[in-house]
């Protein structure tokens, strides 16, 4: 019986939230039709509205990704050596112990 009450409350709250979330469409549409589209939204120059990507920055990011993978694999190899052999492999002046 408690489960049925819980389900009823959850459904009622969900429906209430859905009703409150929908805006009054008639007023918004009338205002938009009267004023027209905003000039900042409309592309008046005919050009593309995408951001340009600098080639050097993109290349630098790719190089950083490659370097981080190499560093990670190197650290992983050092950890596995330490884990299986028990040797005192040093990483940046510290031991794994």
From Swiss-Prot:
Function: Effector that is involved in host plant infection. Contributes to virulence during the early infection stage, by inhibiting plant defense responses induced by both PAMP-triggered immunity (PTI) and effector-triggered immunity (ETI).
Subcellular location as annotated: Secreted; Host cell membrane
Signal peptide: 1-21
One Gene Ontology CC term in the entry: membrane
InterPro entries: RXLR (IPR031825)
This protein's name: RxLR effector protein PexRD21
Tagged with keyword Ribonucleoprotein: no
Keyword entries, A-Z: Host cell membrane, Host membrane, Membrane, Secreted, Signal, Virulence
Organism whose genome encodes this protein: Phytophthora infestans (strain T30-4) (Potato late blight agent)
Family of the protein in this entry: Belongs to the RxLR effector family.
Induction: Expression is induced during host plant infection.
Domain observations: The RxLR-dEER motif acts to carry the protein into the host cell cytoplasm through binding to cell surface phosphatidylinositol-3-phosphate.
Gene: PexRD21
Organism ancestry: Eukaryota, Sar, Stramenopiles, Oomycota, Peronosporales
Position of sequence motif RxLR-dEER: 48-66
